[in-house]
Amino acid sequence: SATRIDRAGLIVKGRENVILQSNQFDTTWITTNAPTLTSGQSGYDGTNDAWKMEASSTGSSRAIYQNISSSGVQVFSVYAKAGTTDWIRMNLSGVGNRYFDVANGVVGSNGSVDGTITSVGNGWYRCSVLGTQNASSGPYIFIASANGDTSVNTGDNVYIQDAQLEQGLAASPYIETTTTSAQAG
């Protein structure tokens, strides 16, 4: 493949998203402990393409994930907004996790992978975790009640939209996928 150079003469990384159905969380995504997923929510981009992810019972580890065979340095990102709870946990399988306060835009202190959070307006944040993935399952998105705690109560919820998994050190602009992965640039 060709190397892209920008106007400043710098090498530019091509973009990719290896997650399937990157914003259809009720399709190729697998649920852990049966969170309820409701589409048609108001999103960060002004569309009604966001999803409410809600705990349908009290307990721990209410999550969604995909089985993806991908290795190397990976960045997993998702847009998230607080609902009735302020926290999410993101996990790269076989690597570790990081907590995010999606009400206040803070990366939690609990976790074993690097995390970043960026405000995109209207209470939405793009959260991302970085690590060297070496397993065929994951990435995960969990509803969390606090930094370091995935125990939730019935009805606890957060809003999510536009997940992306890619090679690299930082999340690139989102690329939507359907039944296949996508690349650009």
Named regions from a protein language model:
Residues 1-185:
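Extracellular and organelle-lumenal recognition/adhesion modules and their flexible linkers in secreted
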